[in-house]
């Protein structure tokens, strides 16, 4: 039963991703690729131009919408009278999640304004692991026994707990299914 449910959801996800691109999206991408000013547009983006605010027009730069509290806004287009108009909007599910969660709480600053990266030694700074995704990594220590002299040594590293990894994967999958 679990496998049939899993494969059913997987089938629906693949079907959704296959049907999500319309012919209009494909022609817009082909037109953009064939434009003469393609290189100049890339150079302009690389200069670090500002993002487009919510409810402002994004017809010329569909990937330049600003980020909300947590999620990035999407450029939604509406064709009216032969002319297309695009506006940066926040997805409904993102609005609900952001209103429920509120502002992202700031984490306390670790020692020396630096945190211990993933898989690095955290034996001396067990509470200073970096943040990975939504959650902060945890310092996990293991007792290692040396084969040659039989001594036990403690090996510590910043790792992501399985529960956190599963929650992040589920949220990513849900976001992919909805949006």
UniProtKB/Swiss-Prot annotation:
Motif segment (Processing quadruplet motif): 44-47
InterPro entries, alphabetized: Spider_toxin_CSTX_knottin, Spider_toxin_CSTX_Knottin_CS
Post-translational modification: Cleavage of the propeptide depends on the processing quadruplet motif (XXXR, with at least one of X being E).
Maturation propeptide residues: 21-47
Purpose of the protein: Spider venom toxin that exhibits cytolytic activity by forming an alpha-helix across the membrane. Lethal to insect larvae.
Annotated family: Belongs to the spider toxin CSTX family. Double-CSTX subfamily.
Organism: Cheiracanthium punctorium
Tissue-level expression: Expressed by the venom gland.
Protein name (database record): DELTA-miturgitoxin-Cp2a
Keywords: Amidation, Disulfide bond, Knottin, Secreted, Signal, Toxin
């Amino acid at each position: 039963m679990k496998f049939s449910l899993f494969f059913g959801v997987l089938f629906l996800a693949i079907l959704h991703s296959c049907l999500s691109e319309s012919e209009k999206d494909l022609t817009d991408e082909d037109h953009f690729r064939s434009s003469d000013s393609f290189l100049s547009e890339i150079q302009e983006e690389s200069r670090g131009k500002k993002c487009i605010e919510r409810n402002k027009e994004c017809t010329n730069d569909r990937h330049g919408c600003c980020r909300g509290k947590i999620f990035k806004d999407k450029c939604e287009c509406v064709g009216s009278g032969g002319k297309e108009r695009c506006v940066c909007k926040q997805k409904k599910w993102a609005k609900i999640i952001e209103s429920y969660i509120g502002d992202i709480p700031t984490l306390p600053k670790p020692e020396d304004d630096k945190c211990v990266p993933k898989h690095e030694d955290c034996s001396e700074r067990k509470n200073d692991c970096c943040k990975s995704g939504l959650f902060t990594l945890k310092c996990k220590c293991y007792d290692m026994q040396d084969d040659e002299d039989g001594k036990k040594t403690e090996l510590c590293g910043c790792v992501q707990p399985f529960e956190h990894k599963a929650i992040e994967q589920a949220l990513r999958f849900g976001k992919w299914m909805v949006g």
